[in-house]
Amino acid sequence: MLDLTNQESDSSENGNSKYADSTDGRGIGTSRRLDDEDLDERRKDLADLVFWMSGLKATTLPLDDHTSLCNGRAFAEILHEIDRSFFDERWLETMPEMRTSSNLVVKRSNLRKLWRKMSDYIQVLNRKVVSTRWTEIGDRLDGLDETDIPVAADLAMAVVSLAFIGKTQEKYIQYSQELPAGEHQHMMANVARLVQIVMEELPEVPTFHEISELDGSQNELNSSHVESSVITNGNGSAERRSTLSANDQVLVEAQLEIDELRSERDNLIKDVERLTKALESSQLDTSTCSEPNELSILEKQNEELRVKRRQAEERVLELEASMEHFQAIVVKLTDENDTLQSGQKELNMLKTHLDTAQSDVEEWRTIANKYQSDAEMLKKREKEVKELQGQVKSLTSRLEHHVKTATIDEDNKAGIVQLRSQIGTLTANNVELNVGLESKKRIVEQLELQLIQYKEKVKELEDRKEDLIAERNELENKLLFKESVTPRSLHESMFEAGHLSFDDKTKLPLEIENKRLTERIQELESLEPLKGEIIKMKSQNGVLEEEKLVITKQMEELERQVADLQEKLTKNQQHASGDVVELKVQLEKANVEVERMRETEMRTEAKLAGVEELLRKRNVEKEANETALQKAKAVIDELESRNRPVGEDNKTSVQDFKELKTENELLRQKNEALETALNTTTQSLEQENRLITSAAHQQILDRSSDSMMIMRAQAGSDHPQTLLDTQKMTRALPWRFGISSMLIIFMVWFFINTFCEVNAPPKA
């Protein structure tokens, strides 16, 4: 078990020597690294203290990690378990539980708050700190084992010692006695030694109840009492410190005077006893003494002793009267001291609240300065945005100029010249083909005329042939008829016809027929070359017909090409006019986007104006809080200067304290309202930032190549098919789109950075 009277604690002077390494010559903590041996010893001490604290089960935080202990939250929860009335829930809420261990500023602030509260508790316990072990303990943290382990060990020593000297010390003494003594005996002995060291460094302050006898000037004590209680001036905290130091000085002087009076009383009592014994012995020896000189000497000595005894008795009576008088004064001063201690406790609580409010005011002041710098930065960036808008206008005008000059003048002219050269070439080819066609047509017409003539001749020959055939048939019929008639009649007819002889008359038809047949044969023989020529003409006519068909097809192809070229020319002209219209539409859309960005800028300016208005309100409230803080400090100084019992000067100091508490509560509510308004503003700014970011990303996506093709299709133009469309798509539009995209991306980046800086949380 833990024994505070252990003999091992006698070596506290030697055991305390290792702690001198963590302080400099003035006793102020430094971050000088310890040796490995000293560091291991401090780690062992911390482990023993952690074992004792872990049995309390006052916290769920890890106690075996010195980094977590240096946050201060675990020690605060253990102190809350030790004395719930002093280390209350409200104070415990001011010690945040950190999720990260790398923020040294917050850790140092937590340790300073923790030690201030522990110092107040030590004063409440009527003790004082005479060691420099905990001086500026928060500033000794450097995030290293060589600095953090000694700090954690010193705080653990103080926390465990407060458990043994606090109001609930019986509970923890009983707890220490119930711990197993066998396996942890050395650990408990080490804890007892450390607690003994701390108790020597936190001695009790002597009170007036310890004063038994007082001697000296009553006026000096009364004047000291009057000087400590009456208001001498209104200089605030400086007078308060001088008054407290004067009270301590009076107490020390009174204690010294009491010790002197005690020693003087003891000496006088010893002298009285010695003289009494000498008197008794002298009376016994009177009978034996015969010399008158010796008797006279003894009588003189006896008389002197009686006088001294009488003086001593009178002195004792005076001292008893003074003691009774001073006992009444001591009782009165004790009551005043109790009242002052209670008032000091309330003042300490009020100081804590005021320190918290002052730190909050400093944080708000830092935030206000940051917002003011952000507002100035926003104004500068607003000027930059205006300059960029002017550049956008100039770029837009240059874009229109380049689109009109480069796209219409160069591309359209080059395409039209090329098309005209193609049309000229095709027209020349068409003229040549038309000339050839005309010559071929004339040849065909001549051949057709010759063919018609030959056909007429053939028709005439065929008619002649038919006539000859009909005549031959008629002659044959006649010949047959003549053969069928009588010879007389035939003879007569032949005689009548030519007065020929009978024999000649029979030969004449045959000769005629023979002659006719010969002529017919000659005619037929003369028709044979004509038939060959007819066949030849027919073959030539067929060839010419085929050439005519080929030429006709070529003419149709040329006409189709001319029509296609004319159609392409018409489409190019339509595309040129349509692209100009499309560019105008895109410019209108760009203007709409610029207007939208202007509206966004106006909204941002409105938000900025709101933030500036909020900053102005925060500044006004900050000034009001500072004014209230100054008033509270003045009231505190006045109350501390009036540290006297209630009703002594017909005023109620408790009522003033209540008023200050009420005012402090109002200030805390104002701070909470300001925090709520700040959180609301931050959320609205974050929402606006997200909306602007999403709108900017949507605009960037809308300006992609796919969306441009969709916009082109919606505008009524087809995909690029001509040289002009290809040149426009590859030259005119991409660089304009690139400039617009870069401008939008820059503005989005600007707004994102601006709102991120505005919404950044304040650094501790």
UniProtKB/Swiss-Prot annotation:
The chain crosses the membrane at residues 732-752. GO terms for biological process: cytoplasmic microtubule organization; cytoskeleton-dependent intracellular transport. Keywords: Coiled coil, Cytoplasm, Cytoskeleton, Membrane, Microtubule, Nucleus, Transmembrane, Transmembrane helix. The keyword Cytoplasm applies. GO terms for molecular function: dynein light intermediate chain binding; microtubule binding. CDD domains: HkD_SF. Residues 43-169 form the Calponin-homology (CH) domain. PROSITE patterns: CH (PS50021). InterPro entries: CH_dom (IPR001715), CH_dom_sf (IPR036872), HOOK_N (IPR043936). It comes from the Eukaryota. Homodimer. Interacts with the dynein subunit dli-1 via its N-terminus. May interact with microtubules. Belongs to the hook family. This is Zygote defective protein 12. It comes from Caenorhabditis briggsae. The gene is zyg-12.
